Amino acid sequence: MKIAVMSCIHSNYEALNTVLLDIDKHSCEKIYCLGDLVGYGPYPNEVVAQIRSLNVTTVAGCWDEDIVEGLNSCECSFPSLLAEKRGKLAHEWTNKEIHPENREFLAQLPHTFREGNMAFVHGSPYSNHEYLLPELDAFVALERVLSTESDVLFCGHTHVPYVRTLDAAHLQVRIKGENGKEQERSFTAPLKKIVNVGSVGEPRHGRPNATYVIYDTNTQEVTLREVHYDYHKTVKAIIEKGLPAIFAWRLAQGMEFAERADDPTHVCTR
């Protein structure tokens, strides 16, 4: 069976519709969405309504959670004060625009979804704000997959697609026992995969094209899809609706405008 997995639509209705047409062209039997339906872009209600109407299996993203709770992410979730300021502007705008029925839909989205040997999350199994970057320490990456009790972990959040295979390996770890003494344990970790599906509506891989993944559950083949769409329409709408112009520039470039946080695994506990 072929499935399509997408993430980070970010209120970009033009990109979503183009990706859905591409999915249909490739005869995928099921669609999964890894959250962040809203935020940054100009069409939050249209995007949520489309996902609802198609009954797409969806998990919550960090933006979806924040809009439901009516909160901004705290400052330590942003790599800079400028990024925080822009993020809060987008949050406040989206919070005012979102319709009650769409907010209710976002509120009931689960953090994690499992099906067969596959797990689906937005950021990581631990937090929607954690980035599973391709250069993440192999042991940490493996632990994240093992925590889901799956073989393939699909994620988004970084807006940059990649496939990482964690080869089978014999591992030795030290665990503190009840008496406080460390004990050595060994186990064999089977082959696992992390598949980051990129972003439909706000790509950051250096091009403005929407990205998503097609996965064959029979052959385990992963196909990273990059789809052209008329991003100029979304760029124009961002400006017309009064959102920060930098969002339009970033969308047109397919680039991040701010520096990355020093610790991508850091999650605020406040």
Each model region followed by its residue ranges:
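Metal-dependent catalytic neighborhoods of phosphoester/phosphodiester hydrolases
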Residues: 37-54, 67-79, 131, 164-166, ...
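Short beta-strand scaffold segments in enzyme catalytic cores
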Residues: 112-114, 161-165, 211-215
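Beta-strand-turn-beta hairpins that frame and shape the catalytic cleft
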Residues: 1-3, 113-120, 188-194
